[in-house]
From Swiss-Prot:
Gene Ontology terms: cellular component: autophagosome; cytoplasm; cytoplasmic side of mitochondrial outer membrane; cytoplasmic vesicle; cytoskeleton; cytosol; dendrite; endoplasmic reticulum membrane
Coiled coil: 140-268
Modified residues annotated as N-acetylmethionine in this record: M1
Task performed by this protein: Plays a central role in autophagy. Acts as a core subunit of different PI3K complex forms that mediate formation of phosphatidylinositol 3-phosphate and are believed to play a role in multiple membrane trafficking pathways: PI3KC3-C1 is involved in initiation of autophagosomes and PI3KC3-C2 in maturation of autophagosomes and endocytosis. Involved in regulation of degradative endocytic trafficking and required for the abscission step in cytokinesis, probably in the context of PI3KC3-C2. Essential for the formation of PI3KC3-C2 but not PI3KC3-C1 PI3K complex forms.
Listed name of the protein: Beclin-1
Gene Ontology MF terms in the entry: GTPase binding; identical protein binding; phosphatidylinositol 3-kinase binding; protein kinase binding; protein-macromolecule adaptor activity; ubiquitin protein ligase binding
Region feature Disordered, mapped onto this chain: 47-66
Subcellular location(s) of the protein: Cytoplasm; Golgi apparatus, trans-Golgi network membrane; Endosome membrane; Endoplasmic reticulum membrane
Protein species of origin: Mus musculus (Mouse)
Subunit organization: A homodimeric form is proposed to exist; this metastable form readily transits to ATG14- or UVRAG-containing complexes with BECN1:UVRAG being more stable than BECN1:ATG14. Component of the PI3K (PI3KC3/PI3K-III/class III phosphatidylinositol 3-kinase) complex whose core is composed of the catalytic subunit PIK3C3, the regulatory subunit PIK3R4 and BECN1, and associates with additional regulatory/auxiliary subunits to form alternative complex forms. (Microbial infection) Interacts with murine gammaherpesvirus 68 M11; the viral protein binds BECN1 with higher affinity than cellular BCL2.
Reported consequences of knocking out the gene: Death early in embryogenesis. Embryos show a severely altered autophagic response, whereas their apoptotic response to serum withdrawal or UV light is normal. Accelerated neurodegeneration (conditional knockout in cerebellar Purkinje cells).
List of residues that carry Phosphoserine: S14, S29, S88, S91, S94
Residues where Phosphothreonine is found: T117
Amino acid sequence: MEGSKASSSTMQVSFVCQRCSQPLKLDTSFKILDRVTIQELTAPLLTTAQAKPGETQEEEANSGEEPFIETRQDGVSRRFIPPARMMSTESANSFTLIGEASDGGTMENLSRRLKVTGDLFDIMSGQTDVDHPLCEECTDTLLDQLDTQLNVTENECQNYKRCLEILEQMNEDDSEQLQRELKELALEEERLIQELEDVEKNRKVVAENLEKVQAEAERLDQEEAQYQREYSEFKRQQLELDDELKSVENQVRYAQIQLDKLKKTNVFNATFHIWHSGQFGTINNFRLGRLPSVPVEWNEINAAWGQTVLLLHALANKMGLKFQRYRLVPYGNHSYLESLTDKSKELPLYCSGGLRFFWDNKFDHAMVAFLDCVQQFKEEVEKGETRFCLPYRMDVEKGKIEDTGGSGGSYSIKTQFNSEEQWTKALKFMLTNLKWGLAWVSSQFYNK
């Protein structure tokens, strides 16, 4: 019973392939190791390298023991031991087997045997660059590689042999020829070295010149960049000046066009537009007159009289005419005439209507005085232009205007004892005479 227990608790230690890490089943020759075999395997190692004293004494102490054979038992646990090169020497060659105390002899023999097997693999690994143990397939692969290496080595050996034979067959003449060639090659080498030194010197000179040229090129690049910036600035200023010049030229051209238009423009016609609207004569769109059917506001009539006074005043100034007996005072819709004989007397050319309009005759006196000024203008024009003639003859003493080219009747410019129709027609004829006078002045003084 105890033997069975001891047998079931025994641990088997196995090895793995150092290339593919597959578990190995060792050959039976590793299980039977005698003293002679151990000495044969360890002899090369002891002659080439110094063995550790402890290991030698341990092997000599255990060399007289009887060989043993490992038997596999059911229920035995197995443990893989890592390769010896990946562990220290002490740990690689030390094994601890756990079992019953009563089976101490068997455990000691197994431990010694495994230690010896591990040492053998260490010896094999130390002799080559390959770690041991190896499985059969890895061993075959290794052998193929070694065969290939052997063939290469043999080929090299053959080549060396042939070279040696050629050298041995060479005579003294060939040796002298080779010596001459060697001297020539040495001279050639010296010449080439000298040329190389000259080239190196030239290279240094060229490098220095290149640095100078690069510095000069950099300076020129900077100057070029500066010139480019200055050119761009000048170009920008030129474009701005060109734009300003074109703008000024356009302004001058526009001003010239406007000047030409102004030269061709009749200032009096542009300023004083005399026309008619039905039975009314108009000046600058202000109606001068009044009808029962069209009761024009007195503000509009006063404004029309103001424009009429301004027109006659401008024509007289253009001709250098000074009126006798009266002086025109253009004052908008409150224009009037001053009597030159009585400075305190003013004749208003404006009216507000009402009852006072029918009893106050100053407005009528002012209109008759204005008609007198128009007659003086006509007479002044006739002095220099005998053919000048107004379309409607004026009778200043009666204060009437005759329709010489039409019905032949005369119409009073006064409002008292007169109808609005006749008064309006008289004012229309007066504006027509002023329009003719304006046209004559424009033709005579257009270029002055």
